[in-house]
């Protein structure tokens, strides 16, 4: 069995695909899983580390771009369809799984036109442009949220939840302390702005130090900055004397969640799936320019259920963030309630559900032959 998993660009699209690949290999060790993505997406960094082969095509996103960049992206999309045809004829997959985003468009569309079984995964409550189009061609669509059903044909749509990698749920707190060089017994805050970092979150967290300086010796941070802010953020930690580990990118996300007493992050669907799978209290800061405002909608669900606190980007400042950090640091009871609510929302078996659908599609296709 050969499975092509197409997409990436950001961790939010890519990591659910890795979770599905893990489950496929768990069920059928001989399964051949190949990823397709772009050389400038996060998949070029992550997939080789995960041990899967990856093939590249030409593709760029069009949403939120200037007119000239949209024209360029449109041309690249045409190229991606031609590239996909070449790759799929070489790989001869039994099924193609699309993860959403621009890198999935060419492979899934081409597979559908070649009568190769296709599955599309949609992580957000408001589907992106690529999946809205691909949903018309795909054999099956796997959704995270019920609200997404209206965008797709109901008879081909399944609510599976958003797949989470096994390493997210199996990581242990004790080993995570050693991995990140953190002190046992200190209140640990994990900060990240998504797989690519977030300049505003980095700045506001650093600005909060002056408001929580009195508890400096009792807390520590694990802070993923992204490449561009790494040096400046690290220097700010040194200047204020706050303890912790500052890194451009965290590869061991499961360990990062395991060691955290509190998470401060954006509200991408994959981040929320991981948070709820492990039940971590969080302060969520939705990215304000996400398509369809889906991050705010995602975060609002958790906030309403008591699993997280939400601070909108336009309301975010260092003093507000510091107040929330202090409140949650001082109230173990509140954190425990948030943890319980978060776990109740998690779907740690989402990868199994998606693979069930993939396998049923393959069985149906084989019967038809």
Where are the language model's segments positioned?
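Nucleotide-activated sugar donor-binding and catalytic core shared by glycosyltransferases
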Residues: 1-369
């Amino acid at each position: 069995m050969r499975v092509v998993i197409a997409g990436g660009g950001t961790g939010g699209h890519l990591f659910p695909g890795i979770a599905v690949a893990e489950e496929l290999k768990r069920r059928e060790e001989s399964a051949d899983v190949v990823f397709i993505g772009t050389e400038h997406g996060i998949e070029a960094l992550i997939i080789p580390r995960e041990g899967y082969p990856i093939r590249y095509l030409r593709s760029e996103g069009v949403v939120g771009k200037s007119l000239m960049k949209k024209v360029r992206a449109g041309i690249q999309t045409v190229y991606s369809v031609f590239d996909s045809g070449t790759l799929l004829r070489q790989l001869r997959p039994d099924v193609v799984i699309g993860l959403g985003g621009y890198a999935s468009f060419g492979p899934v569309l081409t597979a559908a036109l070649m009568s190769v079984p296709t599955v599309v995964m949609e992580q957000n409550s408001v589907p992106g442009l690529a999946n809205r189009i691909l949903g018309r061609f795909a054999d099956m669509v796997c959704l995270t949220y019920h609200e997404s059903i209206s965008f797709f044909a109901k008879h081909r749509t399944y609510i599976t939840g958003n797949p989470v990698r096994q390493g997210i749920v199996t990581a242990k707190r004790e080993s995570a302390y050693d991995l990140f060089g953190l002190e046992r017994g200190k209140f640990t805050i994990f900060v990240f702005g998504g797989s690519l970092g977030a300049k505003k979150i980095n700045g506001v967290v650093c600005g909060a130090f002056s408001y929580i300086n009195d508890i400096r010796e009792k807390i520590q941070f694990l802070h993923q900055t992204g490449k561009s802010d790494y040096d400046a953020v690290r220097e700010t930690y040194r200047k204020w004397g706050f303890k912790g580990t500052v890194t451009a990118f965290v590869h061991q996300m499961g360990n990062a969640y395991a060691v955290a007493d509190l998470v401060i992050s954006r509200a991408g669907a994959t981040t929320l799936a991981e948070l709820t799978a492990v039940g971590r209290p969080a302060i969520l800061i939705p990215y304000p320019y996400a398509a369809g405002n889906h991050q705010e909608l995602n975060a609002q669900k958790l906030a309403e259920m008591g699993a997280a606190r939400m601070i909108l980007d336009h309301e975010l400042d260092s003093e507000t963030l510091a107040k929330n950090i202090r409140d949650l640091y001082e109230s173990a009871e509140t954190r425990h309630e948030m943890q319980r609510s978060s776990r109740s929302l998690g779907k740690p078996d989402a990868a199994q559900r998606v693979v069930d659908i993939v396998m049923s599609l393959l069985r149906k296709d084989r019967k038809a032959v």
